[in-house]
Amino acid sequence: MNGAAQKPIEEANVWIRDSFDSEREWIIELSPSAINDIEKAVDAAADAGHAPQDLRPETFPLPRLKATLSDIYEIIENGRGFAVVRGWPSERHNHQENLLAFCGIAAYFGEAKVQNYEGEPIVDVIDKDKPYDYTSRGYMSNKRLPFHSDGADLVGLLCLGEPAEGGTSLLLSATHLYNTILQEKPEYLTTLTRGFYHHRRGQHDPGESPLSPERIPIFSFSNGLLHCCYNRNPIEWVVHEGIALSDDEIEVLDYFDALCHRPGMAVEMEFRRGDMQFVNNFVILHSRTEYRDALEYKRHLVRLWLENANSKRGAGGLLDIYVPGSSKVSQEHAAE
């Protein structure tokens, strides 16, 4: 990975909210025949005893949906960078069947990776009454999550339960952010490409450093393509280990965050039960508003981190600091 090229990015993933006429542009509705295919594949996978995270296209055949899923991956990899698959009838299936359906579809986009120190490839995003601080992960809280990236090539979310209020999903183009910074504050790119240490939030072995071993660039380029890796909170939480950000670094981060929240930058979406959202983690930043659950039902998402060996943007990311030795970058280093 090398430093950022000082020229505007011209790709399909450079967009603002007004680039889209309506949500219909990113929603792909499942047809009855496609749903039937998925249900048959779910039954076959269950009968064969396949674990959801181990599914592959060959063990989860979807003849009527295969071409559509190929088109969706093209959108995620080379297009706007995100898509929502809508129409899966999650309410008529049990939890295991829903996991098989979600992981089976996701298998056409990439391989499920472990997401945390506990070794979980499938994570429940649900309020566990945990604080969102340097001792826990954001998926355990109902608090607002600022714009950030996750740990692998792609992020997948399946909605199994809606909140009483809040929980809006927001996405924005990291390539558009880069272009805007290049135009408005090009001098900030030095700090953004140098990067920052991240707090590992206890996701490491005893005796290991609580910080990332190296600075993680917010902007870097791999194969000539932008790779954005950002989460401000773990950057600031290094103060608990005796490291303070400089005034200049805080100024750059404040500008970056203000730019993320500039009106017209992000698209918003409300998840329905059965929705499956897939996002290119290296060109899209995502956020979530705070939410409130009802007494009788809760917001419940299931998350996958996916890696695709054919991704043009395949490079290291936050996966390395939360799951040491698990990511492809760590595996490559171990093989050297």
Residue locations for each model-derived region?
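"Short basic amphipathic alpha-helical interaction patches in structured regions
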Residues: Q96-C103, L171-S173
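A short alpha->loop->secondary-structure connector
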Residues: F102-K113
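Active-site environment of non-heme Fe oxygenases that use a 2-His-1-carboxylate facial triad
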Residues: M1-K66, S70-I72, N78, A83, ...
